Amino acid sequence: MNASSSETLEVVDDRFQKDRSWTVAWIAGLIVVGMVLVLAGMGRRFWCECGSWVPWSWDIWTAHNSQHLIDPYFFSHVLHGVLFYWALRWVPRLNRTQCLLIALGLEASWEILENSPLIIERYREATMAVGYTGDSIANSVTDVAACMLGYWFSSRFPWRWSVALFVVSEILMLIMIRDNLLLNVLMLVSPIPAIQEWQSG
């Protein structure tokens, strides 16, 4: 193969990579837009009713929780991305792009399910979130972004870093708000009254 042919192949390969990147970006965008439209159709409001445009809210016991861009549960969604990356990595015949889009689709689907009346009521009955009314659309979009951040982190650093991120995040959340991803799942699936009492204390 001469130099001219080699350069031509490189140009074609670069163009293919760019086209594929744009395709992935379009699909990812459609997933997020689709989630937003579904949430809007479910009657979810875009932002906190309080009218304050402060992008964060750190007090989980107020009506601001899950209504702004960032709250303490942002870090749980980062861990979603960590878990999705390592779970999907071992699924046969899936390439990196497919794994990424599946992770994005799973997180978007969870945001829709989480804001359904069934799950909202379950949160109110079984967890410390007795006043939970669902997420704002803006918060759901940020949660998806947090998931992608965790996914990116796990894809770029050795597995030990993912473990460290998971453990440190869970411990810090437990100290700060008496809740974390593992406790949240446990209380949703099989509530333990003693834990609920401790969380509310």
Swiss-Prot record:
Entry's family note: Belongs to the UPF0314 family.
Positions of transmembrane segments: 22-42, 68-88, 157-177
Name this polypeptide is given: UPF0314 protein RB9128
One cellular component term from this protein's GO annotations in UniProt: plasma membrane
Recorded coiled-coil stretches: none
Keywords carried by this UniProt record: Cell membrane, Membrane, Transmembrane, Transmembrane helix
Membrane topology: Multi-pass membrane protein
Subcellular location: Cell membrane
Tree of life domain: Bacteria
Leader sequence segment: none
Cited InterPro entries: DUF2585
Main location group: membrane
Biological source species: Rhodopirellula baltica (strain DSM 10527 / NCIMB 13988 / SH1)
